Amino acid sequence: MAADRDNFLQNIENDSINNGQAMDLSPNRSSSESDSSILMNVNDIKTLRLDVAPEAKSTQSKKSLFYENSDDAEEGEIEERTNKEEGQYHHKGSKQLRFEVGKESTGKLQSHLSDGSATSGEGNVRPWEFRKVIQAEYRERLPRNYELKHWKKPSKIMIGSILRLLETNTVSALDSVFEKYEKEMNQMTHGDNNEVKRIYSKKERLLEIILTKIKKKLRQAKFPSRISERDLDIEYIYSKRQFIQNRYSQELQNNERLEAILSREQNLLEETRKLCMNLKTNNKKRLTEKLIQKDLHPVLNKAMEYTYGLESTNGFMHPDGPVTFRNDSHELNLMLNDPIKSTADVRLDKEEVLSLLPSLKEYTKKSKELKETMGQMISDSHEEEIKEVFVPHHESHQDKTEEDIH
């Protein structure tokens, strides 16, 4: 009976294993994760056996977290995926290039394939693939015409500086998260501080594990060769920030001081300009007064008048009138209340002038008589001169003719 019972259980176990393999190899396997887990539990013969004690949950299926995967396994998966993608694209390219196509079409095809592979590679990047993530971030932040050709693995100093930056933010990140979800934590723990501390310490250990994982991945990643070790050092970043702030404040102070100096110089320039104008006008007035009073040397009078514009070429100053007339009026004490009328304003008839000035009649009469007498005297004198010249000549000519006759 015992042997038959063991054979029966063995047959059931073999049938369940065969059914499981057939389900795994079937192409139309489209059930959900919950259904597959139920089938696995049903098909597992050990769960149905009553003569064997059930195994612990930890030994049955141990759940692996995303940060606990081994680096070698992850790298193997990445290499297998990249090889498969390259094989697929190579196979597609070889199929399309079997036909005779022009060079332009083949170039377009190759560029299209390269663009497609790049986009698919960037789209399928996982967070822990630091090499691809770093390259994608640098290419996204840098301009399109800038190309990074040389990459290198980070040094220990660079990795230490990056981890130092992350470690300084872990405490603040934990505190901010616990402050944000304080009500939920109190509701879940019913105000038990020990439970809250336990959760806090658990999250600290989780962050420590993540940091160790980041450290391992950073060793395998690559950074641009132009980045130096000190660019990611927290002390260098802080000192550089402080230096820039101090320099900026210094430049602001210098700018304010220059603005104050500039405004002061502008005010001084305006004052000097006004002073020069006042001095020029005062010198002009003083020189005119001295020229009027003739306090200067007589040799300098005319030169000063022409040099300082006190007298123009026509003998007149611009606002004050002729200098000579002012000198004469000052010397002769001429005080004229009425303005002098010009000849253009006097419009009188000849009869009115003769009536006002009777002496002009005598003057005109005498001038006429003088003209007549002068003309008569000139004519008489001319006649006498002509007679004196022509009469002796005529007599001499008559004598010569008589001599010739004889």
Curated annotation (Swiss-Prot):
Modified residues (Phosphoserine): S70
Keyword Amino-acid biosynthesis assigned: no
Transmembrane segments annotated in the record for this chain: none
Subcellular location: Nucleus; Chromosome, Centromere, Kinetochore
Statement: the UniProt record of this protein carries the keyword Nucleus: yes
Coiled coil spans: 239-285
Residue stretches of biased makeup (Low complexity): 26-37
Domain of life: Eukaryota
GO cellular component terms given for this protein: COMA complex; kinetochore
Comp. bias intervals (Polar residues): 8-21, 107-122
Compositionally biased intervals (Acidic residues): 69-78
Residue segments, region Interaction with NKP1-NKP2: 353-400
Chain intervals with Basic and acidic residues compositional bias: 79-89, 97-106, 380-406
BP term (GO), one: attachment of spindle microtubules to kinetochore
Region spans: CTF19-MCM21 binding motif: 317-340
Disordered: annotated segments: 1-37, 59-122, 379-406
Keyword entries, A-Z: Cell cycle, Cell division, Centromere, Chromosome, Coiled coil, Kinetochore, Meiosis, Mitosis, Nucleus, Phosphoprotein
Subunit description: Component of the heterotetrameric kinetochore subcomplex COMA, which consists of AME1, CTF19, MCM21 and OKP1. The COMA subcomplex is part of a larger constitutive centromere-associated network (CCAN) (also known as central kinetochore CTF19 complex in yeast), which is composed of at least AME1, CHL4, CNN1, CTF3, CTF19, IML3, MCM16, MCM21, MCM22, MHF1, MHF2, MIF2, NKP1, NKP2, OKP1 and WIP1. COMA binds the centromeric nucleosome-binding protein MIF2, and to the outer kinetochore MIND subcomplex. OKP1 interacts directly with AME1, with an NKP1-NKP2 dimer, and with CTF19-MCM21.
Record-stated family: Belongs to the CENP-Q/OKP1 family.
Further comment found in the protein's record: Present with 2688 molecules/cell in log phase SD medium.
Function according to Swiss-Prot or TrEMBL: Component of the kinetochore, a multiprotein complex that assembles on centromeric DNA and attaches chromosomes to spindle microtubules, mediating chromosome segregation and sister chromatid segregation during meiosis and mitosis. Component of the inner kinetochore COMA complex, which connects centromere-associated proteins and the outer kinetochore. COMA interacts with other inner kinetochore proteins to form the inner kinetochore constitutive centromere-associated network (CCAN), which serves as a structural platform for outer kinetochore assembly.
The protein's name in its UniProt record: Inner kinetochore subunit OKP1
Organism: Saccharomyces cerevisiae (strain ATCC 204508 / S288c) (Baker's yeast)
